[in-house]
Amino acid sequence: MISVGQKIPSVTIKQATPEGGSDVDPAALFAGKKVVMFTLPGAFTPTCSQKHLPGYVKELPALKAKGVDMVACLSVNDHWVMKAWAEQHNALGKIVMLADGAALFSKALGIDADLTKGNMGVRARRGVLHVSDGVVKSIDMEAPGKFEVSSAEACMLKLG
């Protein structure tokens, strides 16, 4: 798994946009910015839809007030799913929705989880990374089935 002090890896994934999606390299996207990136197993899944994404949408103004330039959401879904999910939660254009369809970024970060037993394939683990100018400043990954350290509220506490 990526460690504190390491640079975000350079890979090409998709960012959900109002038009659909565009290619993006998170390493370039995060350069020069203070970023909170929360990661999750899947759009439209219960915890992700009821708690994770809505929490970050709600706390976005407070996160910005603490100096965060960008809040990004990473999931192993295609950009069309991420776009529809973001629209449903009024997040499109507010939260940067990163669609890691082939789990390339999740694997490069070392946060991939094999959920094939649950018929979900390879996914991203639930967690949150604080990144400054492309360098990981902190990483908190959840234990399987938990939602304790990666919530927007926990993120706010960590930022002080």
Over which residues does each language-model region extend?
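Chalcogenol-based redox active-site neighborhoods
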Residues: 1-160
